[in-house]
């Protein structure tokens, strides 16, 4: 294993792991994908209608809906308060775990452990399900597991002269104690903090793992990966979660629901199930940025008995989203161990924006550290960490390279694995390294897909999902998209399909040098007030697509 000089390591950070910890003495942890919850649809034609909240509804939440709209300044102040409180909670958990050394607190994997424990402790529905399942298992003679507890793998520091190593230890907590500590620290139920953590984990999953199996299972081509943002977000992530999901993720949810309805024709006679299905489609419609796309969703909504034809329509819709990108909110989500360092970093602001300067400045001030798994390259690991924090899995690598001054590589060229260390790799004396990539320039985050202009692309991933609002050509593999356009458009909604295909072809015919986010510039990281706009310099020798020819392990193959 690699090791690290004590003097070369400072403060810490985290990254996100894909699973929620299953508690107990011998329970294995596995990714959780929840079925659709059954909340009534919103009639408001907002861009991102309020989704279902599995375990995050309360009287306080209901009261919040009646409050007057906050001003931008009030929002930034409340966000600052949230991230500071998350940091305080992390420090309290580390004290309870008996890990008081700065090295231990700065480690990404320790922050991961605290985040997973918090999510497991606050997921009442999952806990209830686990208890009922375990009660049945005990009757069958299986081992009894205490689901009132949850735990995680932490890493304790070991010093050896001028070298430090980390050794894994398993620590468990009572769920009620964790919940009480969190609510007391946050001063409320802290739903926004939980959502923030969930989005961070989802962004890390998008960067570290491919989702080819999940795409193929619903009949979508793996080249549509750029539309699949947020595919591991749990439903309890609420409105915020829907806003950060890609169009393909919502299409996949709808196709899975139709598959269930085809197997059980009585499913959509249940008003609750029908409401949940309509909610998914309404969310999908509001994601769409073109009238032709919305019209196609309307066709599916109007179908009395959803079936193969509707799946074909949704598949075409997902393909169109490669060219005309839907609205996907981008956020900077940092590990809570970085938030815990805000007082020491001298980050003295009263306001904080997850989509603007403050988040990027905080990222640059922090010095995150990660465990290195066997064969990991520290610089490559730093790229994974940067892309995780900024949700940049599907951003153009040329843009990221211009902002950081570091040449970014596609996933297949990176010599590193994800941040979660599987049990079989946890050994005594693991090395660590600084995550060294920093921003030289900054630009605001975006929530739109930019214009439908195209450039040259590669194989594998065939389009980008912009994260930074800075003028640039949008990378798009026209050849790959044209292959997808050769499909049958006959049937009940031939006109709707024809209009959508025409829109895609018109878009493809545009000049390749057209730019998205016209007039948007980047700024020096020291230029908080945007006084000196700078034209972005795109380096043509760097590949566009992170998942161009992917060799990453699939999320569904992980054994936690």
From Swiss-Prot:
One of its GO terms (cellular component) is host cell nucleus. It holds the Pfam family Flu_NP. Signal peptide: none annotated. Its main location: virion. Keywords: Capsid protein, Helical capsid protein, Host nucleus, Host-virus interaction, Ribonucleoprotein, RNA-binding, Viral nucleoprotein, Viral penetration into host nucleus, Virion, Virus entry into host cell. The keyword Nucleus does not apply. Residues 1-74 are annotated as: Disordered. InterPro entries: Flu_NP (IPR002141). Belongs to the influenza viruses nucleoprotein family. This is Nucleoprotein. It comes from Influenza B virus (strain B/Ann Arbor/1/1986). The gene is NP.
């Amino acid at each position: 294993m690699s090791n690290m000089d004590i003097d070369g390591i400072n403060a810490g950070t985290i990254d996100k792991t894909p699973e929620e910890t299953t508690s107990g003495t011998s329970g294995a942890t596995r990714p959780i994908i929840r079925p659709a919850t059954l909340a009534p649809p919103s009639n408001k034609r907002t861009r991102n209608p309020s989704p279902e909240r599995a375990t995050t509804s309360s009287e306080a939440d209901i009261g919040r809906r009646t409050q007057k709209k906050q001003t931008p300044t009030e929002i930034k102040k409340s966000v600052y308060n949230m991230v500071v409180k998350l940091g305080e909670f992390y420090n309290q958990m580390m004290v309870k775990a008996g890990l008081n050394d700065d090295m231990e607190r700065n480690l990404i994997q320790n922050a991961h452990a605290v985040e997973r424990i918090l999510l497991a402790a606050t997921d009442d529905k999952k806990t209830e399900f686990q208890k009922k399942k375990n009660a049945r298992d005990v009757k069958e003679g299986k081992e009894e597991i205490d689901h009132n507890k949850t735990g995680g793998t932490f890493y304790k520091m070991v010093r050896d002269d001028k070298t430090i190593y980390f050794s894994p230890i398993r620590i468990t907590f009572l769920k009620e104690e964790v919940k009480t500590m969190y609510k007391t620290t946050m001063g409320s139920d802290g739903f926004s903090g939980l959502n923030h953590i969930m989005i961070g984990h989802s962004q890390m999953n998008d960067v570290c793992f491919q989702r080819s199996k999940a795409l193929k299972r619903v009949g979508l081509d793996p080249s549509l990966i750029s539309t699949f943002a947020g595919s591991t977000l749990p439903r309890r992530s609420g409105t915020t979660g829907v806003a950060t999901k890609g169009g393909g993720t919502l299409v996949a949810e709808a196709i899975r629901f139709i598959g269930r309805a085809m197997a059980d024709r009585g499913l959509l006679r249940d008003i609750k199930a029908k409401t949940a299905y309509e909610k998914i489609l309404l969310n999908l419609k509001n994601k769409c940025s073109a009238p032709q796309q919305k019209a196609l969703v309307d066709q599916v909504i109007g179908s009395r008995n959803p079936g193969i034809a509707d799946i074909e329509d949704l598949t075409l819709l997902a393909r169109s989203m490669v060219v005309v990108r839907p609205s996907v909110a981008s956020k900077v989500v940092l590990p809570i161990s970085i938030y815990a360092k805000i007082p020491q970093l001298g980050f003295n602001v009263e306001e904080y924006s997850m989509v603007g300067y403050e988040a990027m400045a905080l990222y640059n001030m922090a010095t995150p550290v990660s465990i290195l798994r066997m064969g990991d390259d520290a610089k490559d690991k730093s790229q994974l960490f940067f892309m995780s924090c900024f949700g940049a899995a599907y951003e153009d690598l040329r843009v990221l390279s211009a902002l950081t001054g570091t040449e970014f590589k596609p996933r297949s060229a990176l010599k590193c694995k994800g941040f979660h260390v599987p049990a079989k790799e946890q050994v005594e004396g693991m090395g660590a390294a600084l995550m060294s990539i920093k921003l030289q320039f900054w630009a605001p985050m975006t929530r739109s897909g930019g214009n439908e202009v195209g450039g040259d692309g590669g194989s594998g991933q065939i389009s980008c999902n912009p994260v930074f609002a800075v003028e640039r050509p949008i990378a798009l593999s026209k050849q790959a998209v044209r292959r997808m356009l050769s499909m049958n458009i006959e049937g009940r909604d031939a006109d709707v399909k024809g209009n959508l295909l025409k829109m895609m072809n018109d878009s493809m015919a545009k000049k390749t040098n057209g730019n998205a986010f016209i007039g948007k510039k980047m700024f020096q990281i020291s230029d908080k007030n945007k006084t000196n706009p700078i034209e972005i310099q795109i380096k043509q020798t760097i590949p566009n697509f992170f998942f161009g020819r992917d060799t990453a392990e699939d999320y569904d193959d992980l054994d936690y």
